[in-house]
């Protein structure tokens, strides 16, 4: 699907419970600025901000649903208003079968926005009828009835990702076991199998960021082999996370106090990961300076 000059605009709409929120999250991961249920006039103002010189907003996604008063009229107004700026917003319409929507609402124990005193099925039917013209005019319709989230993500990335890479954000975190495991770690590796620089008098005062400590740690038997092997393993894990739609990962490296070995290994591992496609890597030394 083609992009538009100046600012690219996608209006995300569809049946309640069909996955609008998930679609918005995917677009956000792709670098889109996402706004939820803006009044129509604010959508136009947001676009004007995006068109202004120096603006960082080049891709705007707005989630719209039937809770907005005069929804179909609002949508038409937005499209006509943006047309005066030579912008043709694309419409992404999310839908699912009635039985799937009923099941989702029952599982979440929520009421449908159009249900009122009606049955859930009647509320869904009313919304479907109301949105029929919108669906007919949509640029892309995605049926999530049998679509798992990774496949939904792939469909949206294919349609709206353009040349944008959906980055996986990896945090490599060193820590000391004596202070406890990091609560946010997705995977933990123990590097206490390496000799401890703490017992080398001239290295003890320095951290794993010091060149002498780093050289000492990486020069130990098994250190580089560990780094190479773990790097290859993480490549497999990261690819799997991407397929499952997980964009954030914390890799924890632990030693006794979080000062020498884990710091040096975390730094070296991050350097290897930084060469990977579609990765943003940062290093966090949780317990450095804590001793």
Curated annotation (Swiss-Prot):
Membrane spanning stretches: none
Family matches, as Pfam families: PapZ_C, RapZ-like_N
Residues in the signal sequence: none
Record's keyword terms, sorted: ATP-binding, GTP-binding, Nucleotide-binding
Binding site for GTP: 65-68
Function: Displays ATPase and GTPase activities.
Protein's name in the database: Nucleotide-binding protein MSMEG_3079/MSMEI_3001
Taxonomy of the source species: Bacteria, Bacillati, Actinomycetota, Actinomycetes, Mycobacteriales
